[in-house]
Amino acid sequence: MLSNYVVKEILNDNKLKREYEFTIDNKYFFSQLDAKLLEIAKNVKIPGFRAGKASIDLIKKEYLNNAVNTLIRKIVEDTSSEFIKNGKFGEIISSNVSIISCPDYGMDVSSTSGDPVGDNLVYKLSFEVMPEAPLIALDDIVLSDIEADIQDSDISEFIENLKKQCSEFVEVSDSEYRVKIGDKVIVDYQNRIKGKMLKGGDTKDLAVIVGRGLVLKDFEDQLIGMKIGESKSFPIQFPDNYGVAYLVGKSADVSVTVKNIFMMKAVEENENVIKYYQFKDEQALKDFARNKIKQQFDKISFAIVKKELFDYLDKTYSIDVPECVVTQEINKINQEIQDSAGTVQVDVKAEAMKRVKLGILLVKMSRHHNISINKDDVFSFINTYYSDYGINLNDVLRMLQSNKDFANYISGKVLEDKVINYIIRLVKKDKKVMTTQELNLMLENM
């Protein structure tokens, strides 16, 4: 097909962007169009004619526009694919085609395709190529090797937190006791707007743990200081993010009666924790605490060493990064900032370029050293990074199967961590022993 089109280079910035203008030979175009129309004529059924017996003029009248548009798509696909294959451009990240002009075959092609009419089929092909990345020189890298200094105070603090988790609510018998944050309160309440009871607004025996944020904050705040048997009325306003659309922004009058109060009774002795969690003895409890602290320590130290490595790679290596990938990363970072309610402060473009550059370096490393991931790697990653947040692992696994974007995201993260661990294993180490407090302080200052 090379003899049927001419290619002119219109952009080569000596980096990653390429643009070429393709002009398709008219004789070739029209011969292909005639062949397409004959193919249609042989197979199409037109009322009043037997299959294949309709005149070519009738076929043109009915099917010319469709035939031209189909042919243009095929020629563009065939010529651009052939050119890219023969051009040996390497890995192409994104491409775009724009039609400059189309042949005039006695009809207004622009009326159906939106493309201008001209003497030849001319189109522009634009694309970006993946840059050639250097291989990371492992001999030049020195990273921290952080060893945990877990102290008795760390274990005691961990066990104290376990005690809070196995605490229980006990009924308050003092009639003068007033509701405090953390108490569980049993209430009856009614909601009215302009005197009219809301649907579902008359509720009995609602249990509210004050301070948990499971009901409106204005409602919780009004419960603080109330006694058993006390009733009160107060206004509330439904917030903009309230789950019931027709109530958003509206004010309501609430009447509430406290029927019972339960206060949290903390577990005081280790024996209670041992019994609650079914540990063999106190030493088993302490071993469990030490192991959990070590796991958290290792996660934090990995994050710190990972940042050390990324900072080194960013400073040491310079790569031209594809603009289209940077744009995608900018969108991701902006979404992260939005999700964090503005608590993340970062130079978005610089961070996006850094992430793309590091990704290219790590992909080069994975390919050179044949590093790949399997199902066990994915499951281990999910278990490590999701189990601490109370997320059901089966839900995550189902999402992996049903959501392609999520699956690609997880696969990318798993490969990234596997390459990083490979690098950490082979580079020089600077041994450091740190307490959990020192490690957490370092994490805060990252």
From Swiss-Prot:
Consists of 3 domains; the N-terminus binds the ribosome, the middle domain has PPIase activity, while the C-terminus has intrinsic chaperone activity on its own. Keywords: Cell cycle, Cell division, Chaperone, Cytoplasm, Isomerase, Rotamase. One of its GO terms (cellular component) is cytoplasm. It comes from the Bacteria. It holds the Pfam family Trigger_N. Its EC number is 5.2.1.8. It catalyses: [protein]-peptidylproline (omega=180) = [protein]-peptidylproline (omega=0). It comes from Ehrlichia ruminantium (strain Welgevonden). Residues 182-267 form the PPIase FKBP-type domain. GO terms for biological process: cell division; protein folding; protein transport. SUPFAM superfamilies: FKBP-like, Triger factor/SurA peptide-binding domain-like, Trigger factor ribosome-binding domain. Belongs to the FKBP-type PPIase family. Tig subfamily. Signal peptide: none annotated. The keyword Cytoplasm applies. This is Trigger factor. One of its GO terms (molecular function) is peptidyl-prolyl cis-trans isomerase activity. Its main location: cytoplasm. It is found in: Cytoplasm. Involved in protein export. Acts as a chaperone by maintaining the newly synthesized protein in an open conformation. Functions as a peptidyl-prolyl cis-trans isomerase. HAMAP family: Trigger_factor_Tig.
